[in-house]
Amino acid sequence: MQIEERIVEGHLLAARTTPGNTRRISFAKITEPLEVPQLLSLQTDSFDWLVGNDKWNAAVERRRSEGEDVSSKSGLQEIFEEISPIEDFSETMSLSFENPVFYDPKYTVDECKEKDFTYSAPLYVSAEFTNNDTGEIKGQTVFMGDFPLMTDKGTFIINGTERVVVSQLVRSPGVYFERTADKTSDKDIYTAKLIPSRGAWLEFEIDKRDMVGVRLDRKRKQNVTVLLKALGWTNEQIREEFGEYESMMLTLEKDHTQGQDDALLDIYRKLRPGEPPTREAAQTLLNNYYFNPKRYDLAKVGRYKINKKLGLLEAFDQQTLTIDDVVAAIKYIVALHDGREQIEAPQGTLDISADDIDHFGNRRMRTVGELIQNQLRTGLARMERVVRERMTTQDVEAITPQSLINIRPVVAALKEFFGTSQLSQFMDQTNPIAGLTHKRRLSALGPGGLSRDRAGMEVRDVHPSHYGRMCPIETPEGPNIGLIGSLASYGRINPFGFVETPYRKVTKGKVTDQIDYLTADDEDRYVIAQANAALDDKSRFVEERVLVRQRDGEVSEVLADEVDYMDVSPRQMVSVATALIPFLEHDDANRALMGANMQRQAVPLIKSDSPLVGTGIEYRAAVDAGDVVVATAAGVVKEVSADVIETMNDDGTYSTYRLAKFKRSNQGTCINQRPLVSEGDRLEIGTPIADGPCTDEAEMALGTNLLVAFMPWQGHNYEDAIILSQRLVQEDILTSIHIEEHEVDARDTKLGPEEITRDIPNVSEEMLADLDERGIIRIGAEVTTGDVLVGKVTPKGETELTPEERLLRAIFGEKAREVRDTSMKVPHGESGTVIGVRVFDREDGDELPPGVNQLVRVYVAQKRKISVGDKLAGRHGNKGVIAKILPIEDMPFMEDGTPVDVVLNPLGVPRRMNIGQILELHLGWLAKQGWDLNLNDDKSGADWKQRLIKIHADKAEPGTKVATPVFDGAREDEITGLLGSTIPNRDGVRMIDNTGKASLFDGRSGEPFPEPVAVGYMYILKLHHLVDDKIHARSTGPYSMITQQPLGGKAQFGGQRFGEMEVWAMEAYGAAYALQELLTIKSDDVPGRVKVYEAIVKGENIPDSGIPESFKVLVKEMQSLCLNVEVLSQDGTAIEMRDAEEDVFRAAEELGIDLSRREPSSVEEV
């Protein structure tokens, strides 16, 4: 009986975290017929197709049972079938591959992260060697290398680091027709391009003289009739097919080639100038260019696009060009030139039009699976060459598949792709939304894509066909703007690689629940209504005329019966990060772009706090991002601790969920998971059981809710500066934890092995106080700049011994150890607490790189409180830097004594037009205070009241969280009405009136401010631009090799540039001596620097400065241009420019200064 009670009670407890039962009151008026799809499926589905795992097979079976025509070949099967059989040059032997299989991975994901391994599984293939002469067949299972696997979160672990492969947007293979104006005449020039997935391009062009030309593989242009003749057509056939087109007849007249042979030779001369032309060579060349499957591949998508554009009925597996394709393309372009609107084709009548290259029907996605498949293809092609060579060199009797195959090129191709490709990127793990967005990113850059410098305005611009496919808001600022986008929240990718978006079918004015996914070129054929078109109870349009997007992308009003489809959701057009911005519809697009991008830079705070004003997508974003732990099976929680949750499942099995505790992310932020459930809680599949970084009750929580006032304060918040209350520092409200990893290894050197030890020469005992007997720092030690983390000594070269030393050594047999201190110390500007130490030792069986005997990693954590100079932002692109942190008693306060947390400048709002922040402010106050419509003095049944009662938002407790979805959120009249319905405080007073403003008092004088001030709760993020990472000071450090001036930048421990303008300022003040010091002894007067150092050490006066090194460089440069430059003294004698003198080196040696001129090779050296 007791157990049953526990389970029932557990069921109630679990209800607080089950999906769909969030505590938000939503202001949405539109019901959505479709859930947001799994947000990582872009990555996972593509990889599942590549490896052909059980999940993918199940999906194929399901779609086949629904009557879809789906290929059952995985990406790996496709590519091994493509390469098979590999035949030798005489075609007597062949080798074929089939049935790729994966064995279990050697290490788990966590082990790979810890030990710097790649998370991969061994791939085996069945290989068959056939001797065609004897008919003998030898079969073997061959190991094809370790194949990197994708984790559940859509990432790869490569050498211990988490990486993401970004999907690439490329021009789809197919046929494209363009019309451009000729610069010299007023005629149009028409071009057609047949673009394959790989192989040579075929381009047709009609110039201003109305001649139809063709270019093969971007070479010289020739008449198109030459190509047709080379393909076996006669003049009569050409006249019969194209007789009605003047341009073709004109071209035929100008073409003097006689018959097929003549045409082939003509083409050969143009493609291979200087080589003797023969008919066979010409025929082979043309076949290899366009009709050989090994050299030319349209891919399925190219065949699909050509069939669609030219109205052909070729089979999908016909992946080279056919003569029909060429003729149809010529026919299309001459008809387009002729001004016709339709032509007849095998599929029926075709509408003729030029193409828009930036249309999403002409751009497709190369997702992870395809990118890896292409890379494998390269590797296998290299392997094929090796196999061919070995077939000819080895003895036929002794050949086995294993002896022919060399897997090196395949492994190298994969390694190269994951390690160095532009599309394989170091994962952005600042917070969960950063990771999620990174995995959903669409990039037009990369191999086979565009380059920043050559991409024009048109490619970058928002296109109508992006609607519901690529977010028009979220893209980087700077040189990549518009080239990198983000998949819209409902978008998905079809088997051809085109992005589809869902619509609700409308039949005769009635909106059904049937969902159709349309690609961009399908969508162009339909009339589509917006998601906010009003519907009655029977799902019919309320209005007679509905606002729609027409077939050609124009917006207009049509009768309800003419509508074909309707949007599924108002947030269909935006990405996940953009959909997290409340009141997006009231923000200017430029600021919304900044808001979407800055959410990705928010650091996880110690206390996560989900927003009072959300948009309703917070739960899905957090769970799908993969940082929230969810139950994989239904059952009851058996045991909970900080790092493990054990559950008993309904089928009698047990599950163990391990939580990440204070792990370092790629960006140095802290990944920490906390349990959400208690023992005895009931779990269903998908129930969140632990929060991750930046999540609160399984909702995305990037920042914290703060009481904000919009008012100027003594000019301290001029130009976006922010004033904060000391309370946020004291109560650790904007405090984050940052973890740095420091690594040191002990190697074998030419002079002997390095050693990790506590016994370091010339280091005091107090410096070693926190090291253990191995010479490694203890966990829990507080360290600051310069402290030793790991003691290490490196052998020094043997020096010549004096006779006395030799005598002593002969007597005592003691060899004085010659070692130098190469310990790892805490770098400049860093400090914190040691929270973890990992030691890897070759003797203990750990795998280490060659030459490394020991490897030590030390993790140092810092608790960073908010401070002046840190950057804060809202979700509307309203960012600023903290200028002042005031004591709580000095902050402006409300009538009941509540001090505000943040003071923002009101002038930052009007010109930036991000009004969403003001609405968020007021709605945040409402959510914090709670409301009840019965408290409103306005007794009329106003519209806004009825709307709120209808969506059950007539009452809310204080602290209730609300959701205002994008394009369908709380309206201004609702907020104004609710401000008059807030629950008063315990004294029965409302602090804020109907206008959303309050009377504030100056904390310093106690006087009221003259005007009422807008006050409310706003969600504030702490961004990763922290002042501690940027502040930097230098004493002495590395110098540039040539100019001898200090290097620049914090990473190089560089100096501050004193530039031309600063010099002018010093000149203007007449500060001659200060300026001379800056330009010489503080910069690049090498002997002077040393002398000054010596003078300071000895307490003498500073000597005069000499000639700066950069002046000597200038003289040398002028001399190298054959200009005789001499430096003269006052009396007119030439001064010899000598290098640093002997005494400089003497002084330097005495003072222990290293004067060797060299650039530091790494930051560690600095």
UniProtKB/Swiss-Prot annotation:
Q: Got a GO cellular component term for this one? A: DNA-directed RNA polymerase complex
Q: Which GO terms describe its molecular function?
A: DNA binding; DNA-directed RNA polymerase activity; ribonucleoside binding
A Pfam family found in this protein is RNA_pol_Rpb2_45
Q: Which UniProt keywords apply?
A: DNA-directed RNA polymerase, Nucleotidyltransferase, Transcription, Transferase
Fetch the PROSITE patterns from UniProt: RNA_POL_BETA (PS01166)
Catalytic activity as recorded in UniProt: RNA(n) + a ribonucleoside 5'-triphosphate = RNA(n+1) + diphosphate
> Is the Transferase keyword given for this protein?
yes
Out of the domains of life, which is the source?
A: Bacteria
What biological process terms from GO does the record include?
Answer: DNA-templated transcription
SUPFAM superfamilies assigned to the protein according to its UniProt record, in alphabetical order: beta and beta-prime subunits of DNA dependent RNA-polymerase
Q: What is its EC number?
A: 2.7.7.6
Q: What does this protein do?
A: DNA-dependent RNA polymerase catalyzes the transcription of DNA into RNA using the four ribonucleoside triphosphates as substrates.
Quote the NCBIfam families the UniProt record gives: PRK00405.1, rpoB
Please give the subunit comment from the record. Answer: The RNAP catalytic core consists of 2 alpha, 1 beta, 1 beta' and 1 omega subunit. When a sigma factor is associated with the core the holoenzyme is formed, which can initiate transcription.
Per the similarity annotation, which family is this? Belongs to the RNA polymerase beta chain family.
Record protein name field? DNA-directed RNA polymerase subunit beta
